[in-house]
Amino acid sequence: MEENLYCLRKGTRLIGRYTVEGVLGQGGFGITYLGMDELHKKKVAIKEFFPQGIVTRNIEYEDTVTVTLVGEKENYDKGKERFLKEAQTMAMFSKDKGIVKALDFFEINNTAYIVMEYLEGVTLKQYLRENKRIAAEDLVELLVPLIEALDEIHSQGLIHRDISPDNIMVLPDGRIKLMDFGAARDYTEFGEKSLSIVLKPGYAPPEQYQTHGVQGPWTDIYALCATMYKCITGENPPDAIDRLVDDHLKKISAFGITVSPQIEEAIIKGMSVAAKDRYQNVGDFCEDLYGGYEERSVLGAEESQAEPVVAEANVETKMDVLTEETPQSKYPTTEAVQEREKLISKELSENAGLTSE
C-alpha cells in the first residue's frame, strides 16, 4: 500500500524493539504498519493512533505527532486513552483462539501504539467480495472459535458492538478471528450512563441507534447473525431502522439456498428487531444453532482442522476509536517507556553477543 507523507518511515524503530517495515492500511483514526519484533524475530502488525484531519507529522524532521486543529487537544487525548483501552481489552482475551492477539502497547511520539500478531489472510468482507457466499454448514463450523470467544467476552461483562464482515479475519488455513475492539464497552454499566453510539447499517440493531439504548450480549448476537445472513445469502442484511416500520427481512430459504431449518431459524431469531425476542446470551443461541453448546465446544477448533478457504493476503485493518471520557490513564508513562527501551537494548545486545560466539 502506498505510504502518505504522515506515515512512519521504513526502518523507524519504536521503543528500541519494533522496526517499521511498511504500511498495511490506513483509516480515519490511524495507520497500521507491518513491523518486525527484533527481540523475537517475528513479523507483527503495529497500529498507530493517528486521527486524520486533526493531527500532522513532518517525517523529514521527527516522528512526533502534533495536534493541529484548534480546540481538539482534549478530544485527541481522550481518543488516545480509548485506543489504549482497546489494547487492554484485547490483551484480556489473548488466549482465545477466535480473537486477534494484542502483544504489546505503549505511548511514544505523543501518540499510542498497539502491537498485534501479524495475520496473513483477508477480511471476511474481502473474501465474500471474491467468493460471494459460504455454505451454511461450512460457516457454522468455521464460526465455532469466534462464537466461543464471544461468549468469553460477554462473561467478562463486555460487548464488542462492531461485529461485521470487515472486522473478521479469514486465514489461509480456514481459521477465522475477530478483530477491532475499538468499540467494546462494559454493558453492565448501561443503567448508570449511556453507551456512545456506534453502528454499521445492516449489522447494528435498533438499540445502537439510540443514545440511551439498552445494549448487551443480544446486541452482539444481532450483529453476528446479520453477518451469518450476509455470508450465506450473499445479500446485505436490511437496516434495522427500516425494519421497525416494515420488517421485510427475507428468510434464507427464500433465496433458493439450501439451509437446514435449525440454522435458518436460529439466525432469523437472532436478527429479531426487538431485543427481547432475540437470544439473550450466546449459550442459548448455540443451543439452537448447534443443538448443544457444551457438546459443540468439546468438538471445537482444538480437535477439528478446517479446510483452507482462502489464499494468502495482507491484512488491512480498520480503525474505529471513539473520543469519549475515560478514567485517568494507567498506561506506560514516557519515563517508563524510556526505561524499557534501555532494557530492550541491553537484551538485544546480549542476544547479539550470544549469536556471534
Task: Identify the role of each PLM range.
Residues 108-123, 127:
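Conserved short submotifs of the Hanks-type protein kinase catalytic core
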Residues 59-93:
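AlphaC helix of the eukaryotic protein kinase fold
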Residues 146-158:
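Protein kinase catalytic-loop region centered on the HRD/HxD motif
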